[in-house]
């Protein structure tokens, strides 16, 4: 196995029993691939596939004018590179996007041409079509400076669906069957039975009409309709009675209404006897072709065809007429012998279409179409053209109706056709096929569809959603272009005059900015980012709504297996509607979710991996991943647990066709990070996977000692870590940047052989957490492509590290851990284990007001010297200043209107020249409850306005940093070039050169070292080829310098041009504060098993329970939190964590006493290779073994993969290895080594019972008490009721509600109650009166009339009831 640079430093011991057969795919692939197919930016315009933008353009173009003499054709499109990079867009509040230009061709035809159209003129031009936001490499979008994610949508696939109402509609409980044809866009077509078994159809959920109207409208006559849906009985009229053609299966089960005889007149079935199989056999044996029936047997039957008198041509009876005695007489009169009737019965051949035809009053095709027109457009007069146009537009027009590739495939599969391609509009036979299946269902044949089956729901990804929006914009443009195309020739217009890109831009902007599926990215930690991008929502436009979604849609379905996680979903109203993709899930070309399986042939598991969709999976028998497999791949168990068509069963190995690729296949990323997930109750696992996404990154991330082995994948795929693009040697490292000299074999010719990585330092995330990258390589390290070079937020040596490993004791402690409260040692706070940095962004804008411009300045009257001391000459706070609530960050004054002055004031003004009072201080201050350190300031100035010193200084610093980067690149490029030169020149013969180099001298190394490098180019070589090489190297260095100068100029131009600010804004200043949040009582914490709680007390270290060797616990949890919640995984994690730490301590002790490398190797082999997945420690050098051991001192990290984790024996073995008997005795451990004797920190006495102690990875969640704590004395009041506003954001008060009033009433505290309901709430005069009284030192409350009472009086008056108060 190949170890990466960082993996070698700290190997995670895995307890997995099964080899890795299939690597976890790149976790953001769905988003990135979808958007790249939408753009097809890297494909040449001629080779683009008809999808994404290309498909949208080709579906709308060509646009033809109303008169048909001008048309606008689409040629190709191109995307220009974005003007600003991602970081610049975030700083400036811009959208990271690219301008879209389309090359279109205006073709004008000759109106005079008599026969066929002749092209008169062609104009081709590139037209700007708006901006398309671009996806960042991590799968998000930067819209107006904030990162957003477009969530994929799970919607009902286009196609045809059959269902019944489960007997809920009608009181009898009868099943009413219905069918629905859903196109990708266009009108929905529904068919449904009513309780009387008449079949109706409706378009777009409008009024229902008999289905035969639709069949007539598509051109079928009543005869053809009946022929399509029924089989016929043939009768020949005889002078007495009639003869019926004998069809055996139609008679079985019927009761004979007369004696049935064979040809010779022998009675085979007597009257009133039920016809059974023996009777049929006898009739068959007698070779019966016809059966004689009495005449009344015909009465009540329904004619299948029109009966016409052969001589006169008169229609005697119509198709679908019942045969009556009158009809029979007419038939005999006209000497008609042969008639056909419909064969129906009550069991499997109902007369539904016949009875529908009977209530249908339309006569022919036109009448049927008029009826449909009247239903769609009530009140409009049906002219023939309008009727035809509407009907054709409903299902037959490609503009208005699109089944899509998926819809056609699903439709054809459902109606049993073999080919999966076909026209994208509805065809007549599609409608017929649907009705036939629906009638079959009513007849009891076939099954209805399961709507929640993942074969009937598909995923719409970013690319597809964006394409739909873009198409909608283009369609709006098309309407406008059509209008103007008529004037194109007369007014000599060019394509850009015809096309206005506004509708496209606004459609795209609206989608990315405010669609329900475009969400503000959850960026608390790397896991929350990845999960957000892998989310699949059933809500959104064209999806479900929370209120309408029933229980079935939200429930776990068997087809979710390996596609959608059954665990991770939000609690609350969205449960089950928002899901997460499973680890290995992937979308196929139709948008259906697929999951990988290993192929099994003749009960042998092969390495072939097939991706199966939910429908395909139903056809196979699939074994679980934990089935026992021998070395040669054969399945060894007699019976193997497997799944077939959604059912779990035990089958013999020879029946198995596929096998799961991994046990973690069924869960999502977040759930697969929970160790011992298999021992947790599902509800708690749900909470655990949701709470990991809320973990705040700690100051010093610490890897989980007990993990699942997927931590590295998550950290790397999330993009928070820095990965090497190319391998090479680390040339330079500091906290902000790394320079890597690329390997020769990876460097492209003519390219700079150097990669510079600028790290993200103390940047604010969307959730105000801190994103900061730290290098984990040192100069001289050799790295390969894909190695982790720097850790980001919540990552430790390239692994996800959401919390800290805490020494946990499960025991009650003086009621401080009652009801999930958490007791924490002061040492945890002192060591800054859970300290996190939060970055707040505060903005101030200087606008142009009616009274003059606002000004950002230091010159503010009556501001204390302490406050002014923090501001520079421009009035902006210094970086590094420590600020508290209320401190000024940016000084700003706003002009205010002239006030009328008294003569005295005028005099004073005249004497002192006091002019300061006509501006008011509107400075940016630190909000209440916040304090921190200023870490960054950004100043944006409108174009054409003088920059202040601070703004100029910020630009200069930025340019300085950029120059440093370029110099580094140049230094390495030149170094590299001169090394090659030295190798080339040494030993060559010279014709002369600097320092009087004689002709014919061989050049030596010493001579070159003595010369300045740039003078090497002055050496004249005898060998012409070498001389040419020397020139080439000189040119390439010059060229590189020129390139770098150009790049620098470009950067300077970008920085010095004015900033785009909203209208009316002259200047904007952003100040970033770093706030340090230490752990404190009231903060919410949780483990990974849904074991959440609130910190109740931080206890001095000396009072915490401690072990025999004096080691105190970090956290004390209540043991009662485990049994009822059934999340036993946390206890197993604690045991294994205890073993992991113990092993680390033993390795630390070996290093301390400088044990031999061989002893270290032996111990490490015992840890890694006794059970679980073996590691190749023999391939490590001695130095690597020592470095590995040093990194393991804090605990050997274990991986216990989901559903394939450590067993009880393995845990016991690890505990025995970590704590040999002598160590265990010193620690006071029980013989089983999973409990310890603890002592009370306050009394020193031993606790009565042993306690479970060990290490658990514990997280601090984003619900911090600092953000929630809030107090108010006076503040804003509501306008109408005059009561204080509510909530922290409004600086509101605490509501003293109904129940609180009852409490005071119960105590009889009438004065308290009075002040609560009056002066402390909405008695306006009383409020001021109280203040006056307090100032006078007179502590009396004069309660008046509450304002809300006045509101009540006004409301009663508005009802017309006059109500007055008698004030005495």
UniProtKB/Swiss-Prot annotation:
InterPro entries: DNA-dir_RNA_pol_bsu_ext_1_sf, DNA-dir_RNA_pol_bsu_external_1, DNA-dir_RNA_pol_su2, DNA-dir_RNAP_su2_dom, DNA-dir_RNAP_su2_hyb_sf, RNA_pol_bsu_bac, RNA_pol_bsu_CS, RNA_pol_bsu_protrusion
Subunit structure: The RNAP catalytic core consists of 2 alpha, 1 beta, 1 beta' and 1 omega subunit. When a sigma factor is associated with the core the holoenzyme is formed, which can initiate transcription.
Record-annotated disulphide pairs: none
GO CC aspect terms: DNA-directed RNA polymerase complex
Its job: DNA-dependent RNA polymerase catalyzes the transcription of DNA into RNA using the four ribonucleoside triphosphates as substrates.
Protein name: DNA-directed RNA polymerase subunit beta
Keywords recorded for this protein, A-Z: DNA-directed RNA polymerase, Nucleotidyltransferase, Transcription, Transferase
Catalytic activity of the protein: RNA(n) + a ribonucleoside 5'-triphosphate = RNA(n+1) + diphosphate
EC number(s) from the headed UniProt entry: 2.7.7.6
GO biological process: DNA-templated transcription
PANTHER family named among the record's database cross-references: DNA-DIRECTED RNA POLYMERASE I SUBUNIT 2
Domain of life: Bacteria
Tagged with keyword Transcription: yes
Family: Belongs to the RNA polymerase beta chain family.
MF annotations from Gene Ontology: DNA binding; DNA-directed RNA polymerase activity; ribonucleoside binding
């Amino acid at each position: 196995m190949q170890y990466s640079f960082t993996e070698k430093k700290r190997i995670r011991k895995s307890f997995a029993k099964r080899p890795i057969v299939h690597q976890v795919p790149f976790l953001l692939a769905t988003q990135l691939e979808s958007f790249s197919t939408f753009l097809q930016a890297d494909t040449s315009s001629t080779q683009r596939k008809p999808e994404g933008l290309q498909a949208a353009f080709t579906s709308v173009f060509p646009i033809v004018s109303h008169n048909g003499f001008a048309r606008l054709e689409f040629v190709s499109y191109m995307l220009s590179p974005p003007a600003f990079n991602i970081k610049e867009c975030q700083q400036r509040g811009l959208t990271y996007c690219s301008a879209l230009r389309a090359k279109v061709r205006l073709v004008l035809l000759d109106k005079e041409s008599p026969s066929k159209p002749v092209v008169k003129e062609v104009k081709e031009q590139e037209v700007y079509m708006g901006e398309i936001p671009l996806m960042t490499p991590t799968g998000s979008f930067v819209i107006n400076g904030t990162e957003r994610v477009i969530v994929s949508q799970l919607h009902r696939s286009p196609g045809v669906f059959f269902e019944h109402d489960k007997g809920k509609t009608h009181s009898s409980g009868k099943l009413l069957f219905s069918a629905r044809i859903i196109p990708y866009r266009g009108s929905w077509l529904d068919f449904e039975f009513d309780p009387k078994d008449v079949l109706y159809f409706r378009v777009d959920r409008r009024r229902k009409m008999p289905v035969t109207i639709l069949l007539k409208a598509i051109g079928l006559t009543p005869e053809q309709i009946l022929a399509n849906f029924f089989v016929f009985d043939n009768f020949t009229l005889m002078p007495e009675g009639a003869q019926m053609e004998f069809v055996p299966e139609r008679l079985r089960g019927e009761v004979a209404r007369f004696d049935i005889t064979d040809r010779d007149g022998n009675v085979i079935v007597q009257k009133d006897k039920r016809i059974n199989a023996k009777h049929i056999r006898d009739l068959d044996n007698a070779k019966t072709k016809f059966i004689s029936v009495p005449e009344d047997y015909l009465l009540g039957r329904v004619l299948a065809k029109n009966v016409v008198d052969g001589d006169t041509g008169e229609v005697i009876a119509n198709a679908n007429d019942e045969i009556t005695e009158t009809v029979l007489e007419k038939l005999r009169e006209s000497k008609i012998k042969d008639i056909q009737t419909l064969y129906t019965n009550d069991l499997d051949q109902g007369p539904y279409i016949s009875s529908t035809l009977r209530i249908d009053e339309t006569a022919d095709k036109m009448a049927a179409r008029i009826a449909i027109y009247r239903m769609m457009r009530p009140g409009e007069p049906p002219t023939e053209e309008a009727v035809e146009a509407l009907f054709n537009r409903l299902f037959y027009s490609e503009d208005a109706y699109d089944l899509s590739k998926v819809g056609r495939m699903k439709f054809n599969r459902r109606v049993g056709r073999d080919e999966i391609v076909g026209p994208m509009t509805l065809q007549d036979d599609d409608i017929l096929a649907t009705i036939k299946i629906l009638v079959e269902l009513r007849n009891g044949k076939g099954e209805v569809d399961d709507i929640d089956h993942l074969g009937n729901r598909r995923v719409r990804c970013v690319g597809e959603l964006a394409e739909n929006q873009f198409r909608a914009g283009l369609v709006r443009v098309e309407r406008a272009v059509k209008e103007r195309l008529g004037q194109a020739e007369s007014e000599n217009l060019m394509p850009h005059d015809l096309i206005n890109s506004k509708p496209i831009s606004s459609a795209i902007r609206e989608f990315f900015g405010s669609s329900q599926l475009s969400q503000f990215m959850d960026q608390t930690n790397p896991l929350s980012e990845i999960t957000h991008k892998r989310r699949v929502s059933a809500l959104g436009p064209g999806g479900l709504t929370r209120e309408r979604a029933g229980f079935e849609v939200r429930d776990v379905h068997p087809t979710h297996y390996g596609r959608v996680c059954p665990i991770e979903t939000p609690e609350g109203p969205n449960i089950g509607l928002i899901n997460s993709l499973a680890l290995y899930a992937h979308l196929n070309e139709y948008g259906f979710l697929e999951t990988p399986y290993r192929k099994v042939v003749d009960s042998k598991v092969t390495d072939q991996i097939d991706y199966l969709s939910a429908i395909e999976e139903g056809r196979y028998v699939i074994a679980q991943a934990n089935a026992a497999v021998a070395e040669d791949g054969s399945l060894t168990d007699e019976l193997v647990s497997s799944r077939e068509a959604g059912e779990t069963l035990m089958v013999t190995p020879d029946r198995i066709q596929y096998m799961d690729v991994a046990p973690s296949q069924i869960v999502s990323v977040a759930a697969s990070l929970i160790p011992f997930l298999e021992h947790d109750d599902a509800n708690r696992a749900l909470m655990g996977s949701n709470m990991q996404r809320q973990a705040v990154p700690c100051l010093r991330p610490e890897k989980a000692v007990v993990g699942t082995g997927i931590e590295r994948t998550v950290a790397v795929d999330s993009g928070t870590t820095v990965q090497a693009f190319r391998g090479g040697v680390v040339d330079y490292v500091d906290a902000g940047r790394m320079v890597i000299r690329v390997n020769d074999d990876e460097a492209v010719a003519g390219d700079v052989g150097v990669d510079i990585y600028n790290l993200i330092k103390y940047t604010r995330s969307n959730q105000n957490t801190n994103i900061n990258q730290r290098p984990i390589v040192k100069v001289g390290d050799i790295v390969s492509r894909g190695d982790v070079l720097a850790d980001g937020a919540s990552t430790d040596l390239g692994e996800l590290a959401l919390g800290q490993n805490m020494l946990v004791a499960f025991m009650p402690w003086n009621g401080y851990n009652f009801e999930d409260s958490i007791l924490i040692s002061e040492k945890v706070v002192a060591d800054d284990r859970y300290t996190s940095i939060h970055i707040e962004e505060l903005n101030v804008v200087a606008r142009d007001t009616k009274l003059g411009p606002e000004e950002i300045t230091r010159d503010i009257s009556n501001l204390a010297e302490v406050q002014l001391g923090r501001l520079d000459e421009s009035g902006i706070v210094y970086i590094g200043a420590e600020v508290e609530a209320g401190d000024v960050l940016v000084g700003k004054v706003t002009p205010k209107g002239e006030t009328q002055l008294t003569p005295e004031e005028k005099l004073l003004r005249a004497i002192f020249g006091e002019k300061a009072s006509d501006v008011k201080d509107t400075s940016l201050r630190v909000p209440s409850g916040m304090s921190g350190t200023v870490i960054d300031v950004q100043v944006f100035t409108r174009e054409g306005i003088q920059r202040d010193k601070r703004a100029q200084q910020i630009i200069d610093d930025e340019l300085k940093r950029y120059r440093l980067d370029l110099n580094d690149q140049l230094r390495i490029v030149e170094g590299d070039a001169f090394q090659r030169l030295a190798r080339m020149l040494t030993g060559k013969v010279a014709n002369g050169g600097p320092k009087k180099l004689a002709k014919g001298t061989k050049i030596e190394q010493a001579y070159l070292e003595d010369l300045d490098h740039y003078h090497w180019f002055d050496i004249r070589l005898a060998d012409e080829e070498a001389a040419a090489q020397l020139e080439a190297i000189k040119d390439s260095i010059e060229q590189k310098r020129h390139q770098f100068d150009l790049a620098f100029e470009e950067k300077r131009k970008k920085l010095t041009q004015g900033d785009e600010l909203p209208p009316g804004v002259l200047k904007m200043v952003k100040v970033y504060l770093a706030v340090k949040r230490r752990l404190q009582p009231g903060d919410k914490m949780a483990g990974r098993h849904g074991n959440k709680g609130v910190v109740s007390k931080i206890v001095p270290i000396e009072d915490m329970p401690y072990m025999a060797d004096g080691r105190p616990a970090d956290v004390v949890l209540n043991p009662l939190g485990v049994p009822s919640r059934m999340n036993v995984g946390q206890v197993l994690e604690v045991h294994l964590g205890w073993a992991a730490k113990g092993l680390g301590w033993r390795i630390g002790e070996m290093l301390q006493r400088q044990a031999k490398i061989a002893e270290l190797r032996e111990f490490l082999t015992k840890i890694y290779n006794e059970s679980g997945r073996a590691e190749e420690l023999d391939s490590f050098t001695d130095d690597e073994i020592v470095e590995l051991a040093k990194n393991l001192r804090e605990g050997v990290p274990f991986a216990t993969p989901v559903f394939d984790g450590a067993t009880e024996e393995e845990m016991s073995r690890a505990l025995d290895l970590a704590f040999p008997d002598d160590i265990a005795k010193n620690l006071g451990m029980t013989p089983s080594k999973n409990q310890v004797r603890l002592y009370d920190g306050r009394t020193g006495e031993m606790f009565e019972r042993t306690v479970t102690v060990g290490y658990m990875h514990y997280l601090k969640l984003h619900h911090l008490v600092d953000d929630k704590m809030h107090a108010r004395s006076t503040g804003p009041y509501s306008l109408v009721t005059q009561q204080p506003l509510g909530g922290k954001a409004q600086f509101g008060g605490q509501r003293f509600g109904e129940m609180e009033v009852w409490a005071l009433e119960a105590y009889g505290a009438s004065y308290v109650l009075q002040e609560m309901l009056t002066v402390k709430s909405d008695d306006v005069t009383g409020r001021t009166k109280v203040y006056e009284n307090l100032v006078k030192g007179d502590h009396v409350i004069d309660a008046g009339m509450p304002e809300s009472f006045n509101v009540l009086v006004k409301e009663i008056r508005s009802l017309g009831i006059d109500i007055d108060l008698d004030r005495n």
